[in-house]
Amino acid sequence: GLITKGDLTVSISTGGTCPAAAACLRERIENAIPDGTEDVLEWAHQNRERLKKHRVLKQAVTKAFSLNRPLTEEEIGAIIGNL
């Protein structure tokens, strides 16, 4: 089954081996995706080039997901300033 949250798509399949297991895993993974995921992905899309330029894209996205929200300009500046 597919899990879709905004631009995030996760697919779970057992190749027909055990659809019940796939359904169970799908539910667990869906419940593990934080509520702010769609907002973080949209924010990451809008700031991707700037963050890539400073080589902090992964660090900034990791921080945003840990907070379950997009980073503020101040938080981005702090990450870029710590280079």
Which stretches of residues belong to each language-model region?
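Rossmann-fold NAD(P)-binding glycine/threonine-rich loop
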Residues: 1-14
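An accessory alpha-helical subdomain
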Residues: 16-83
